[in-house]
Amino acid sequence: MNLFNVYTPTLGEEGLEDTIESVQIQSYPNVKHTLVTDTEKGHDQVRTILNKLKPKKTQHFILPEKIGKDGKFRPEYITSGIIHLINYDYWQPLGTGDWFEREHFQNVNFVLEKHDVDWVFAFRNIYDTDKSFLCKDIFESIGFYPVWSTDNYYIVDGQSWCVSKKMLMHLGNCFRFSRENNQRTDKFVFDVFLKNYPKLGCTNKFTMNFRLNRGNEQQLNFARQWYLRGHEVMSEKFPDGKYPWIKDKF
């Protein structure tokens, strides 16, 4: 039975309970959850939540110092190291505040066993900061079709794909180089993975839930409008709901 390990770098921010609980209730039984923090404050906040929830599938790594040359929390730097320290057959990131539907890994495992693929992604739902539903993502993180706003720009969000250990042992260092290439991390990593491992499958299910981060209200409003406009454009382009990026074979 495949072992899946979910990886969440966190400082104990709002929404972590939702993230942890969504892994605990997975219908697929062989799933672990690895939390990593690199500050005392983050450790205390995470510990408080773990003591409250007492999750059986969760392990917590505490790094002795901050990672990143500017002293800030840099999850992409941590990723390149942590992949060598935990057990898994397949690995999936999940950000603090985001969560999976209960059948997420059941669906992922089904595709892995049915098709000759190295990695798998699921579609995502977009939620506002208060967990109110905004829309289904049929416009950006769709893998096999360009994003709604830019031709020839393909991407799967960095929390929507699940990759094999073989891939990470080969390409894991690409996480720490993403900032040096001045690209958003998930786009840079997606391109590197796809170039080297083009056998990408999809569950065709919306089982990853992405929540907008709290912050500058102007930026939040822009993000909301961008997502909603993207959904509107693609809905008008494919009014029958038959999307070309939904495939039965990979």
PLM feature spans:
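Nucleotide-sugar donor-binding/catalytic module of glycosyltransferases
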Residues: M1-F250
